[in-house]
Amino acid sequence: MARLRVYELARQLEMDTRDLMKELKELGIEVKSHMSYIDEETVNLLLEMYSEEDELEDELIYEEYEEEVEKEIKRKSKEFVEKSEVVKKKKGVIKLEEEDLKLDKFAQKIGIPQNRIIQDFFMKGEILKPGQTLNLQLAKKIAKIYDIKISFEVEEREEKKVNPLEEVERYFEEKYSEGEGLSERPPVVTVMGHVDHGKTTLLDYIRNTRVAEREEGGITQSIGAYQVEVNGKKITFIDTPGHEIFTEMRARGAQATDIVVLIVAADDGVMPQTVEAFNHAKSANVPIIVAINKIDKPNANVEKTKQELVNKINLIPEEWGGDTIVVPISAKKGQNVDTLLEMILLVAEMQEIKGLPDGPVRAVTIETRMERGFGPVANVIIKDGVLHVGDYVISGKVMGKVKALVNDRGERIREAGPSMPVMIVGFEELPDSHGMVYSVESLSKAREITSKIAELEQKELRRKRHMKLEEILKMMEQSDRKELNLILKADTNGSVLALNGAINKLQSDEIKINVIHSGVGAITSSDVMLATASDAIIFGFRVKADSKARKMAEAEGIQIKTYSIVYKLIEDLKAALEGMLEPEEIEEISGRGEIRKVFKIKKVGSIAGVQMKEGYVESDGIVRLYREGKLIFEGKIESLKHYQQDVKKVEAPQECGIKLEAFDDIKEGDELEFYILKKVSKKLNFDEEKGE
């Protein structure tokens, strides 16, 4: 038997890699990681040792069973004693809920008859009524009189503004911290990297689809999720767009993922979006596996790429003494892709990726959109629980009943468990594309939670509207800053968010862009009416305008522009912004000359006899006069003559006569600098870093 890596030996022994590493440590065999080698002699000894242990295992099973039964009896007894103690201690500090602030319930809680409390307070000159609602101050006063200690679980209703979804999340936090009921689930993997480094090609090879061929402009423009099976185990892949414009979408992908595969082209190295993708993974505290792609290319340089990983993002490969798994691959030819998948499963095993298979459902939303024949849908990855057709679900203030579940292969399924990517059909409205989806036990519960969330959002919106009004008034007081109003419609919520982010980068001091409305779906007559009222341009991304909207836009003179490639939309918008600016006047030096002689003419003034040294002078140009290096005059030319003839232009090395407008204090030796003012289209300095 040859030497083996730790994870390879664990596979042969049918053991968990982590357990084997613990066993090796107890045996005094030092290994740094799952990738460490074990020599041949040690491998043989371990194989022999574990085969002997298997023979003894059957004899030990009964003894272990007896021990477990004894432990369970002791645990149950302890729980019974603890519960008894809790009941006895209840007289200490009495915990009160908000509904206990009615006098009758309060009296019952503290063990003092309501009538006695009313009588005692009457004797003190204070009147209380049966069932009266108490405030916190009065409740504490009553408790103090009878020397009773109380504590409140909640604050007063008017101060309480808790989002009900926080309580739902708290349930999952408690379950995870307790560790009970958790079981292994498939890893969710995100492939990230620079544009054209091969993300879609890799996923295409793994899943054997033609996604890469369908994308326009070479950019993946929507987030998708797919599940594959490798060596009997499942892996869920999220495909996130690589172009910088979709930073926000990619960041959401990182939040939903367990492992990141950072793909780097061997012929291109670490690029800006590679660094950006790495930062998303790092900030999300997600383990990273590096796939060095395109090793089949003649100019591929794997070692140089590894060096860039170290120098630019401080990822040190395992073979160089670091802890980053690096796998050279060719996504196009499939070379070493199986090894990459094995490494994903290995890292998943080491990370102990788990979920709650029982109880309520919690899912991460990857994308939402309007789907023909289905209405509002949400693509999600289930994190906890099992979602069934017929379940009630909520996402923010939107609720629904699951009418259908569609998996990544387009098949209708009855249920979806942890780590499964699935499309949920049945929402009443389009849910938020970067929210969570939860299951609830009933329709009434769904309505209760969503109505509370809607109420909280309305309060927040009213507060923000007031702030916006103040900002608008302030802007009206300011000077000539131009504004461009836009209406933005796109095919998916993710595209709307990403394009809003890209447009925000184009804001400048000269022009403000107002996206007065953005949404998902076709351009409608309502959009045109809004554009008419606000003098806006309508931009559509991968959507069309319906016939009614087109006719109305033509009649109202509203411009509708539609695009299927992001770059074109942004470039056209830049051109439109620059077209709104007033042309900029720039100064262009045309020539220089020296006054050789001064002619004083009655009723005319002083005429300069000028020797042109370089360039030219024009009759409608502007001149600066310098004396001993100091600027004495700057103004227009009144007349330009050459041999007594009025001319429009004189070039060096010719001589000419120049009369300056409203200035006669000229001397021999004065130097003249001639320039003209040209109007050029102004260019905006777009803030490319804004919103990153």
Swiss-Prot record:
Entry superkingdom: Bacteria
Region feature (G2): 218-222
PANTHER family noted in UniProt: TR-TYPE G DOMAIN-CONTAINING PROTEIN, TRANSLATION INITIATION FACTOR IF-2-RELATED
Region feature G5, mapped onto this chain: 330-332
Record protein name field: Translation initiation factor IF-2
CDD domains to which the protein is assigned, alphabetical: IF2_eIF5B, IF2_mtIF2_II, mtIF2_IVc
MF terms (GO), sorted A to Z: GTP binding; GTPase activity; translation initiation factor activity
UniProt-annotated binding residues for GTP: 193-200, 239-243, 293-296
Chain segments carrying region G1: 193-200
InterPro entries: EF-G-like_DII (IPR053905), IF2_II (IPR044145), IF2_N (IPR006847), P-loop_NTPase (IPR027417), Small_GTP-bd (IPR005225), T_Tr_GTP-bd_dom (IPR000795), TF_IF2_bacterial-like (IPR000178), TIF_IF2 (IPR015760)
Keywords for the protein's UniProt record, in alphabetical order: Cytoplasm, GTP-binding, Initiation factor, Nucleotide-binding, Protein biosynthesis
Region (G3): 239-242
Originating gene: infB
Annotated stretches, region: G4: 293-296
Functional note: One of the essential components for the initiation of protein synthesis. Protects formylmethionyl-tRNA from spontaneous hydrolysis and promotes its binding to the 30S ribosomal subunits. Also involved in the hydrolysis of GTP during the formation of the 70S ribosomal complex.
A Pfam match: EF-G_D2
Compartments (UniProt record): Cytoplasm
Family: Belongs to the TRAFAC class translation factor GTPase superfamily. Classic translation factor GTPase family. IF-2 subfamily.
GO CC annotation terms, alphabetical: cytosol
